[in-house]
Each structure stands twice: as structure tokens, then as C-alpha cells.
């Protein structure tokens, strides 16, 4: 029996223009009324996911920076990683390549976001790996992370916090940065717009896309 659902935001709750599906919000609220714990896991910053928690009415903790920072129900913020190394790497690479900072970095505490020209991507990825850092593109922005800082880490935190077994957890996501939580022995679902590797890892692939899948996913797993 599933007791907790961890949901990605961009592309999973939102459409191509990053507008949240109002239908998804309705189904989340219905599931919560049945006692399901819902958590959001995003690559975005804590102020953004905090606002989503408040205005949607999310009843579980929410994670920003792909699991690097958590806002809990008691109002506390836990930072699991530091952005000291990632910011230093950005400073170094910005002098050698087109790698450049983005607006949301003023709120990032555990990672670094950036823009970059395609010609420099392979070089920056290789240099980051030498320093024990990870570079990936979420489909919406570039992220520079510490090793181990991912959504799989966040799901493990939720599992421990609520004393759950993996088979009591459902994860829903659409892109490559969601794969770490899809590699755990949990239930997995995705929208029709998901990447091929996410679809292959999923127990259920919805026929709907961009947030409209939440109702079908929740119905499939008997959460409504």
C-alpha cells in the first residue's frame, strides 16, 4: 500500500510553458484527504518550492536543488550539501568558457545553476567530474551538483523520516534528473512526455502529458 508520493515539478506537474496543471492540484488534494503524504522534489530553489507547498497545499516536506535542501512542515530548512565547491567551479570556468551564472543562484544554498553555450558543455562536464562534481541539464536549466546530491537522496530522507518501506513509496517524474529516484526499489510512474529511460524504468506510463497524467497515475495506484 502506497503511503507517500514524491513528485517532480517541471514537466511532471507543469506544461511546456511551466504552467502548473490545475487538474493535478485537484488530484493531489484528493489523495491527501485520503491520508497520502505528498512531497515535491524540484531542481528549483527553496523559495519556489516553498511557495508551491503553501499555495497548492502540499502536506509533506518539499525539496529544492534536486534534493540538496529541504523545507519541512515545522518551518525548518535543512541543507544537506554546500555550494562552496560548485560556486568556486563556476567562477573558475566563467573565465575560460561561456559558463555563466543565472538569476536563481542568489537563492541557491547547495548547488549552482548556470547557462552555457553548447560548444563548451563537454569540456565543463569533464572538468567538473575531475573535481567530484556533477553537471546535468534538466530540460529547463543546467545544474552543477555535488556527487550524491539528487532526488534519490531526497526519497531516502523521506523514507527514513516517515519510517516507510520502499514499496510504500511512489515516485513520479519525467526527465533524466529524476532517474536517481527511479533507480530505487519504489513504485515508479511518468507522464507520456517523459524521456525514454524514465519510461523504461517506470511501472506505469500515463497516456497523458505535462501534469495531466497525475489523475491517471493516482487512479492506477489506488490513491483516489
UniProtKB/Swiss-Prot annotation:
Record's function text: Catalyzes the dephosphorylation of 2-phosphoglycolate.
Which residues of this UniProt protein bind Mg(2+)? Answer: 8, 10, 174, 178
Which keywords label this protein? Carbohydrate metabolism, Hydrolase, Magnesium, Metal-binding
Under catalytic activity, the entry for this protein gives:
2-phosphoglycolate + H2O = glycolate + phosphate
Spell out the InterPro entries in the cross-references.
HAD-like_sf, HAD-SF_hydro_IIB, HAD_sf, PGPase
Q: Which residues form the active site?
A: 8 (nucleophile)
The family annotation for this protein states: Belongs to the archaeal SPP-like hydrolase family.
Q: Name the species this protein comes from.
A: Thermoplasma volcanium (strain ATCC 51530 / DSM 4299 / JCM 9571 / NBRC 15438 / GSS1)
Q: Which residues bind substrate?
A: 151
Q: Name the NCBIfam families on file.
A: HAD-SF-IIB, Pglycolate_arch, PRK01158.1, SPP-subfamily
Q: What is its EC number?
A: 3.1.3.18
Q: What SUPFAM superfamilies does the record point to? A: HAD-like (SSF56784)
Provide a Gene Ontology MF annotation, just one: phosphoglycolate phosphatase activity
Swiss-Prot/TrEMBL cofactor(s): Mg(2+)
Q: This chain belongs to which protein, by name?
A: Phosphoglycolate phosphatase
What's an example GO cellular component term for this entry? cytosol
